[in-house]
């Protein structure tokens, strides 16, 4: 297959949650390795307002990959993950479309694909990395909540990682492919 970011395509797309654990234990040069899943073509609904959005499932350590400026509330935490809580962090554009300026969205419920999620935070980050769509247009769920809501099983779309200081990402890729 064709290479994608230095990974063979087939291998990249069929990563499972168990692969993450294996990479964590075997590739010592990796500082943070965190999976993410995403879906496009959803709508975030609050009261009578709607906004086209993407939905992402992330872990708390994603903050080490792309830091989030929280204008309100907080990011996903370990308890959200463990309990697969129906909570979400909304992006800036979603906030601007659904809420009044200056309104605190935390504690309010936003409906996405028929499920209500309590807003725990609003990230004002534009998301310069653009991993799986813009942060400003995403509803972010705890990874485990997203797995359940969309029946994803152990499927992972993208693995994000950072190398320890002094290690080149290009040096890591062959190790991670094994």
Identify what each model region corresponds to.
Residues 54-56, 60-80, 84-178:
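Mid-to-C-terminal secondary-structure elements
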């Amino acid at each position: 297959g064709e290479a994608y970011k230095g990974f063979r395509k087939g291998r990249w797309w069929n990563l499972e949650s168990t692969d993450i654990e294996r990479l964590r234990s075997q590739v010592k040069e990796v500082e943070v390795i965190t999976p993410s899943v995403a879906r496009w073509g959803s709508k975030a609904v609050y009261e009578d307002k709607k906004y086209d959005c993407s939905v992402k499932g992330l872990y708390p350590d994603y903050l080490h990959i792309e830091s989030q400026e929280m204008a309100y509330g907080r990011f996903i935490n370990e308890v959200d993950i463990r309990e697969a809580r129906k909570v979400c962090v909304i992006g800036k554009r979603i906030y601007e479309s659904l809420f009044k300026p200056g309104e605190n969205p935390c504690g309010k419920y936003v409906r996405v694909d028929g499920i209500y999620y309590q807003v725990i935070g609003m990230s004002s980050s534009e998301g310069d990395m653009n991993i799986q769509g813009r942060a400003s247009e995403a509803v972010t769920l705890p990874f485990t909540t997203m797995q359940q809501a969309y029946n994803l099983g152990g499927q992972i779309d993208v693995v994000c990682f950072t190398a320890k200081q002094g290690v080149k990402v290009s040096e890591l890729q062959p190790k991670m492919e094994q």
